[in-house]
């Protein structure tokens, strides 16, 4: 076996250091929690069911907590560990469904559900990750159009009734004038006959 030269040793040392640093970086990166939110803003209409979707990566079993921040403060929605029953707040009971990946589904949303939703995934104290989703809920515009359509249909019905009444009144007036002319014609004929008789 031939002896190692000095240059060959130094080439091996940087490769070893590089491998050490890559391994250390992966170990440090694998500790803790990673949180992914695919959609940070969601637009919805009243009475829809909305999925607030997230995904996390961690080595242990985390605790997942969702909070809601309306204009007046912070309100806890739900807290759970995957595989265990969720602790749902009274305000959202029967309106929320949890998933093991950390996502929640809100049923039958209303305008008052608009606001920021904060998810916190905690693996152990000191190792947590938070994210925010903005939910905007708006009224259904079709209700306004429905009201306008009903209003115009009602106006059209009233117009048809008024036109029908005007036609009936016109027919009555025409018949009345016809009778009057006939009577006037008869009376004129009688007067002429009487004048002829007197002469």
Curated annotation (Swiss-Prot):
GO terms for biological process: filopodium assembly; positive regulation of excitatory synapse assembly; protein homooligomerization; ventral spinal cord development. Its main location: membrane. Keywords: Cell membrane, Cell projection, Developmental protein, Glycoprotein, Membrane, Signal, Transmembrane, Transmembrane helix. SMART domains: IG (SM00409). It is a single-pass type I membrane protein. InterPro entries: CD2/SLAM_rcpt, Ig-like_dom_sf, Ig-like_fold, Ig_sub, Ig_V-set. The chain crosses the membrane at residues 147-167. Residues 35-138 form the Ig-like C2-type domain. N-glycosylated. The keyword Membrane applies. Residues 28-146 are extracellular. Residues 169-185 are annotated as: Important for CDC42-dependent filopodia induction. SUPFAM superfamilies: Immunoglobulin. Disruption phenotype: RNAi-mediated knockdown mice have significantly lower density of dendritic filopodia and dendritic spines in embryonic hippocampal neurons. Lower density of excitatory synapses and significantly decreased dendritic spine to shaft ratio of F-actin in the later stages of neuron development. Aberrant neuronal migration in the cerebral cortex of developing mouse embryo. Neurons settle in the marginal zone (MZ) closer to the pial side and the corresponding percentage of neurons is decreased in the dense cortical plate (dCP), reflecting the overmigration of those neurons. It is found in: Cell membrane; Cell projection, Dendrite; Cell projection, Axon. Residues 1-27 form the signal peptide. Residues 168-199 are cytoplasmic. It holds the Pfam family V-set. Disulfide bonds: none annotated. One of its GO terms (cellular component) is dendrite. Can homooligomerize through cis interactions within the same cell membrane. Cell adhesion-like membrane protein of the central nervous system (CNS) which modulates both the position and complexity of central neurons by altering their membrane morphology and dynamics. Involved in the formation of neuronal dendrites and protrusions including dendritic filopodia. In synaptogenesis, regulates synapse formation by altering dendritic spine morphology and actin distribution. Promotes formation of unstable neuronal spines such as thin and branched types. Regulates neuronal morphogenesis and migration during cortical development in the brain. This is V-set and transmembrane domain-containing protein 5.
């Amino acid at each position: 076996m031939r002896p190692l030269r000095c240059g060959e040793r130094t080439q091996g040392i940087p490769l070893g250091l590089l491998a050490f640093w890559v391994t250390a970086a992966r170990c440090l990166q694998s500790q803790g929690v990673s949180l992914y939110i695919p959609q940070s803003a969601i637009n919805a209409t009243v009475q829809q069911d909305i999925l607030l979707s997230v995904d996390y990566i961690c080595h242990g079993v985390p605790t997942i907590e969702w909070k809601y921040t309306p204009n007046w403060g912070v309100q806890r929605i739900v807290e759970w560990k995957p595989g265990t029953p969720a602790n749902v707040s009274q305000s959202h009971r029967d309106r929320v469904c949890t998933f093991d990946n950390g996502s929640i589904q809100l049923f039958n949303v209303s305008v008052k559900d608009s606001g920021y939703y904060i998810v916190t995934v905690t693996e152990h104290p000191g190792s947590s990750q938070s994210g925010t989703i903005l939910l905007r809920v708006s009224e259904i515009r079709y209700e306004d159009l429905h009201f306008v359509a009903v209003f115009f249909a009602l106006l059209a019905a009233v117009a048809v009734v008024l036109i029908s009444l005007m036609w009936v009144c016109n027919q009555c007036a025409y018949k009345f004038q016809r009778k009057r002319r006939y009577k006037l014609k008869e009376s004129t004929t009688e007067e002429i006959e009487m004048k002829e008789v007197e002469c």
